[in-house]
C-alpha cells in the first residue's frame, strides 16, 4: 500500500467509523493521514489532543469551530486548516458530502481499531 514517496489510496478499503463517517488510514512513524468522507449534517464534537492537526478539503464544505477564540470558519474545497496541539475544536458538515484529508503529528493511535465519538 505504501512505498517511500507514495501511498496508493485506491488499495485501501473504506472503513465505516460511525453512521455518515468513512475513512482510509495511513500511519507512518511520526505522521498519520486519514482520508475521510462525511455525510450531510454530520457533526464532530468538541475535542482537543496532543497531536498537531492539519488538513485539506477535497470536496464540499465544513464549518470549523474554535470555541476558545469564539470563531467559526467555513472551509471549502481547495482550502486547508491547521490546529495547534491541545487547541479545542469542533466542526460540522452543513449540507453536502465532504471528503477531506486529515493529517496528525504525532499519530493518534487512539483512533485506530475503535469507534470514534
Kindly give the residue locations of the regions a language model identified:
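Short acidic-glycine-tyrosine-enriched beta hairpin
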Residues: 69-85
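Short, conserved beta-strand element in jelly-roll/cupin
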Residues: 37-39, 49-64
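A generic structural motif
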Residues: 65-67, 92
Amino acid at each position: 500500500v505504501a512505498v517511500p514517496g507514495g501511498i496508493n489510496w485506491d488499495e485501501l478499503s473504506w472503513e465505516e467509523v460511525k453512521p455518515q463517517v468513512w475513512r482510509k488510514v495511513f500511519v507512518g512513524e511520526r505522521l498519520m493521514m486519514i482520508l475521510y468522507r462525511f455525510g450531510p449534517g454530520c457533526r464532530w464534537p468538541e475535542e482537543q489532543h496532543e497531536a498537531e492537526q492539519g488538513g485539506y478539503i477535497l470536496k464540499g464544505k465544513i464549518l470549523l469551530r474554535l470555541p476558545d477564540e469564539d470563531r467559526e470558519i467555513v472551509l471549502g474545497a481547495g482550502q486547508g486548516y491547521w490546529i495547534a496541539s491541545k487547541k479545542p475544536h469542533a466542526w460540522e458538515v452543513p449540507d453536502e458530502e465532504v471528503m477531506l484529508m486529515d493529517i496528525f503529528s504525532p499519530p493518534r493511535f487512539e483512533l485506530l481499531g475503535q469507534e470514534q465519538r
